[in-house]
Amino acid sequence: VAAADRARAVELLEANGYTVAILAQPDYRNVEEFRQFGQPKLGFLVSAGAMDSMVSNYTANNKPRSEDAYAHGGVAGHRPDRATNIYVQKIREAYKGVNVLIGGIEASLRRTSHYDYWTNTVKRSILLDSKADLLMYGMGEHSLLEIAALLREGIPARQIRNVRGTCWYTSRKE
C-alpha cells in the first residue's frame, strides 16, 4: 500500500485498539521473514504495494524494469511477479489456518476475471489464485474496521459476507 494509505490504515486500526505490525517488501523466498512477528491474533492483511507488481516489474514491451520507484533505494527486483499471490502463499506456508485478507491496487484491479497482458490470457479472480480468505477493494478503510471487528468477535474471514467492498468465495450451490 502506498505510504499515505498504509499510514491511514495503521492509524485507523491503532486508534480502534488494534496492534499492527508492518512487514514491508519481505524477502519472498524466505518463509522465516513471514514469521518474524509471530502469528497474528486476527490475521494478515496483504497488499502488493502502491503499484501492481507486474507493472512495477516490467515495461509495456515486457522488458524488466531497471528501477522500482516504490522500493528502498529505487532498486528493482525486490518485489516478486504477482506479489499478492506469492505473499499469501508464504503466509500459508508459515501459518496454517490463519485469516488472510488481500487488498490494494493489485487485488482491486484483479478481483474479477481479467485480461492478463503478460500472458495474453484471461485469468480468474486473484482471490481464487492467491487462496486468500477475503478480498477488499477500493478505498477500504471503513470495510477494514468492520472486518477487524468481526474477526475480533471470532468470525473466520471466509465466513464474512456482509461487508461492502469485499469479495469472497462461494459454492455453485449458493
Model regions and ranges:
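Short helix-loop-beta junction
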Residues: 8-19
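Glycine-rich beta-alpha loop elements in corrinoid/cobalamin-binding modules
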Residues: 5, 24-174
